[in-house]
Amino acid sequence: ISRDYNQVHINPLDTTLATFRIDYPFYKEGVGHAAVGALGQASLPYNYFERPQYRNFSFAEGFDVYTYRMENVPFYNLKRPYFHFMYLESGQKKFREENFSLTLGHNISPTTGFNVNYRSRGTKGLYEWSRTKNHNLSVAVSHTGKRYSVHAGFINNHIETRENGGVVGEWAIRDTTFEMPSGVPMKLTSSEATNTYRNNAFFVEQSYGIPLLPVTESDFSIANLPAVFIGHSFEYNSWSKVYKDVRGTYTDDRYERDADGNFVPQDGLEYYKNWFINPTQTRDSIYERVISNRVFIQAQPWDRNGVVGTVNGGVGLDLHTYSQFRLDSYLNGKYDKVDKSSYFVYGSVEGKIKKYVDWGADAKFYPSGYRGGDVSFGANLTLTGYIRKRPLILEGRFRMETRSPDYWQENLFSNHYVWLTPLRKENETRFEVAFRVPDYAFEVGVWQGIVTDKIYYGADSQITQDNGTVSVTSVYARKDFRIAGLHLDHKVLLQWSTNHSVIPVPLVSAFLSYYYEFWAVRDVLRVQFGVDGHFNTRYYAPGYNPALSEFFNQ
């Protein structure tokens, strides 16, 4: 469901055969992600243009492929009750990965239904101190009548991770043999570092349609009539993060070489350089809440599928609350709380020309106050042709944004990192062109992005802002071959960045999946077996800082 309008987005048909063999969600789309570790842990897409950009609580960006949000909560319209259960596990009990999902959907009437989706993914970890639990729940209710429609939902995301800080050196993986992976030395093992994330959200979006022509009994809906829709969107969304550790050290057996070329070990090394609040242990608690209200109008001049399908407009007000520990908390006995409000106007227009052309344009502007001056506008055009009833789809997209930094990028007080840093707005322009032939599993795409004043985390994990302009170009190709039951799937991504110290990307990334598929029992049990391969060229891959829950450039 759209945040701005009571407008649903149709998802591809969900089947157990589509990418069923891929149990890591960060490998299902594109060429995959650079992952911190196993199932349930943070990851970052190789494709720069697929990387999430959260306006609120950016600490959760690394878990984007797992979490439910208002825009990705599924709704179902069913003729029969639907139930789907899945449980997968792998590895020995001591290192086990588990993937559990449950979906229940039911329509009370042809226009009213509800569904529950629950996902639990996690690992006990091959490496020391890497256990992760990732739980995600969504409960949704929808009603789509002739005039009145409503979509509502509740979301709970709960993530617990043990943070080991990564290996003490490349030598521990590259040219050293350990009897078990659990023997590989990690930087934060003795520190017993953990992160706990909690998210609760509730939303309801509703609209009422006023037809401009009489509605007859034969009209199933007013989508084919001139009409005006008036609606309201409400969302309550709260996130919290608690990071804990104790002061510990690690030993690097190959810290440096002496004059004879022999390795010299170094003990007493610490992962964090600073302990601002407590010199022996850490408990950093951060809380953020956003209460959002939007009022919108959708004008339908002719019908929903007309040349000008809808002309939309709305106003919104977001109430932000941020809470963290500060030195003042010693005096007043409670965490510091900051309240901010941002208001904005937005609009869009979209239409179709039969089944051959889809087009749209949108804009959003914050006039003043918090995030004042932020602006976003974009356009899209889709051309569809047919050869022997097989579609050929050409898509183009454009987006230009000026956006303020996240609150935590300018204000942070924690045991290991402290900053009060005014930052400039980022400016980014993106172009995208894609060509798809679905019946032949063929797709190519090109992205071009130009970013000015990019905000990122430097090699010391400190917030940093570039003073120039960075250009990123990506070229993507996908082609799947099928020979009887044999599947040969290929995805390749090429990327270029004009400044790898600001936006590092691999030149080549690829994902290959070769497998054979057949019916073990006709129409009852289908089997797939094969091999998947991931590849990327050498580059300065991002590191991950547990205290900040952010990827940083190395």
Model-derived segments and spans:
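Membrane-proximal, glycine/serine-rich, low-complexity loop/turn segments characteristic
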Residues: 1-200, 209-224, 386-392
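Exposed, low-structure sequence patches enriched in small/polar residues
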Residues: 78-80, 189-252, 256-261, 265, ...
